[in-house]
Amino acid sequence: MKLDQAARGLFLTELVSGFFLAMRYFFKPKATLNYPFEKGPLSPRFRGEHALRRYPNGEERCIACKLCEAICPAQAITIEAGPRRNDGTRRTTRYDIDMVKCIYCGFCQEACPVDAIVEGPNFEFAAETREELYYDKEKLLANGDRWEREIARSIAMDAPYR
């Protein structure tokens, strides 16, 4: 028994086997991504930064029904509706989302009858102050304009499952 232990210690078999194990994993393809330069695929149902969408003619989609405000469990959405227009429709005068309160549940997107409020593909929207995470209507519309192509593609891919 002692001779066997001495032989293992002399030949450093454990060290050598550990070295070969490390070398085997060293030359295998990496399992991780180099994040800032490589990004993994996002699901069509990914819920990121909020955006307000427009119709192709440039008119905003939101009809001020306030369903998203009512269904929000975090009470992060505040909407004020303007007076009815001549054609009987309403538009919002104020649409604010407090992203600090938001839990990204997606209920607002599910409740919207005209797909006006959506959670887009952007997940890189860090801020230095809390005030930057208070989104007003202009910021939400700008997000919608910036991400419209990706948002439309995600909604089209998810449409059969709705």
From Swiss-Prot:
Q: Which InterPro entries match?
A: 4Fe4S_Fe-S-bd (IPR017896), 4Fe4S_Fe_S_CS (IPR017900), NADH_quinone_OxRdtase_chainI (IPR010226)
Q: Which UniProt keywords apply?
A: 4Fe-4S, Cell inner membrane, Cell membrane, Iron, Iron-sulfur, Membrane, Metal-binding, NAD, Quinone, Repeat, Translocase, Ubiquinone
Q: Report which reactions are catalysed by this protein.
A: a quinone + NADH + 5 H(+)(in) = a quinol + NAD(+) + 4 H(+)(out)
Enzyme class, spelled out: translocase
Q: Name one GO molecular function term.
A: iron ion binding
Q: How does the UniProt record describe the way this protein sits in the membrane?
A: Peripheral membrane protein
| Binding, [4Fe-4S] cluster 2 | 72, 102, 105, 108
Instruction: Name a GO CC annotation attached to this entry.
Output: plasma membrane
Cofactor: record remark = Binds 2 [4Fe-4S] clusters per subunit.
In what residue span(s) does the 4Fe-4S ferredoxin-type domain sit?
52-82, 93-122
By its UniProt entry, which SUPFAM superfamilies does this protein fall under?
4Fe-4S ferredoxins (SSF54862)
Where in the cell?
Answer: Cell inner membrane
List of residues binding [4Fe-4S] cluster 1: 62, 65, 68, 112
Single Gene Ontology BP term? aerobic respiration
Q: What is its EC number?
A: 7.1.1.-
Q: What does this protein do?
A: NDH-1 shuttles electrons from NADH, via FMN and iron-sulfur (Fe-S) centers, to quinones in the respiratory chain. The immediate electron acceptor for the enzyme in this species is believed to be ubiquinone. Couples the redox reaction to proton translocation (for every two electrons transferred, four hydrogen ions are translocated across the cytoplasmic membrane), and thus conserves the redox energy in a proton gradient.
By sequence similarity, the record places it as follows: Belongs to the complex I 23 kDa subunit family.
* Protein's recorded name: NADH-quinone oxidoreductase subunit I
Task: Record the organism.
Answer: Xanthobacter autotrophicus (strain ATCC BAA-1158 / Py2)
